[in-house]
Amino acid sequence: MAFITEIANEAQWKTEVLETPGTLQVVEVFQSWCGPCKAVQSTFKKLYFDLNDRPLKFYSVSSERLSSLKEYVGKCKPIFLFFKDGKQVEKIEGVKAPQLNRIVTELSGKNPPPAAPAAAPAAPAAEAS
């Protein structure tokens, strides 16, 4: 799907995922023999359109293509890696749409403005004598 970019090589991985500051990158790691998980594509599509005002990108990559992902070769379930400022900040194993939804929403959120301090109770007025 057009909103998911497939990572083809280490150079693209480095440029798009590890060297892109300020953006949450959601990376689906799949096996070449089963391809990207179709079960989560609707979840990703909904998140993509619902959160289009946030710095958020979706990627898919076969674990066999990148030496940096060799630990995931042979896994029977998809792995979802979350990167921000070049660092992995979260990982989900398996198709867990509610958890994916929650994590993407939380990690892609803009920092809310600080809460205003609570107003101190008003001091009683001094009585005139």
From Swiss-Prot:
The segments labelled Disordered in the record are 107-129
Please state where this protein is localized: Cell projection, Cilium, Flagellum; Cytoplasm, Cytoskeleton, Flagellum axoneme
- What spans are recorded as compositionally biased (Low complexity)? 117-129
Give me the disulphide-bonded residues.
Answer: 34-37
Source organism's superkingdom? Eukaryota
State the InterPro entries in the record: Thioredoxin-like_sf, Thioredoxin_CS, Thioredoxin_domain, TXND_domain-containing
- What CDD domains does the record tag this protein with? TRX_NDPK
Which terms are listed as keywords in the entry? Cell projection, Cilium, Cytoplasm, Cytoskeleton, Disulfide bond, Dynein, Electron transport, Flagellum, Microtubule, Motor protein, Redox-active center, Transport
> What does the record list as coiled-coil region(s)?
none
Q: Which residues form the Thioredoxin domain?
A: 2-109
Q: Which GO terms describe its cellular component?
A: cytoplasm; dynein complex; microtubule; motile cilium
Chief location bin: other
Entries under PANTHER family matching the protein: NME/NM23 FAMILY MEMBER 8, NME_NM23 FAMILY MEMBER 8
The task this protein performs is described as: May be involved in regulating the redox state of functionally important thiol groups within dynein.
What quaternary arrangement does the UniProt entry report?
A: Consists of at least 3 heavy chains (alpha, beta and gamma), 2 intermediate chains and 8 light chains.
Return the protein name: Dynein 14 kDa light chain, flagellar outer arm
